[in-house]
């Protein structure tokens, strides 16, 4: 009896980018705000600064100059559990998209706040 291989999951469409400020909606860190350090679209997870802290036990390795001990670091959380914080209204909001026409007949899609309409993309 052959074991069927699982297909790799399709990448998840995540509207968050690195350096965005987000607010955690669920879990043990509910209500905390932090900066996005990394986005993994393959697994649908984001790494948020000072959120979901775990203790990592590390063995010393003198060859690689790694000091042993218990290190505290962030763990990834599901992107559906966070919302972006608007810099204008300072609230956790959903993201809308506006299409702006630029020179040469091209269009650029920008992320905007659904509550106040301010652009969320950095210049």
Curated annotation (Swiss-Prot):
SMART domains: KOW. Transmembrane segments: none annotated. GO terms for cellular component: ribonucleoprotein complex; ribosome. GO terms for biological process: translation. Keywords: Ribonucleoprotein, Ribosomal protein, RNA-binding, rRNA-binding. CDD domains: KOW_RPL26. GO terms for molecular function: rRNA binding; structural constituent of ribosome. Pfam families: KOW, ribosomal_L24. It comes from the Bacteria. PANTHER family: MITOCHONDRIAL RIBOSOMAL PROTEIN L24. NCBIfam families: rplX_bact. Part of the 50S ribosomal subunit. Belongs to the universal ribosomal protein uL24 family. One of two assembly initiator proteins, it binds directly to the 5'-end of the 23S rRNA, where it nucleates assembly of the 50S subunit. One of the proteins that surrounds the polypeptide exit tunnel on the outside of the subunit. This is Large ribosomal subunit protein uL24. It comes from Solibacter usitatus (strain Ellin6076).
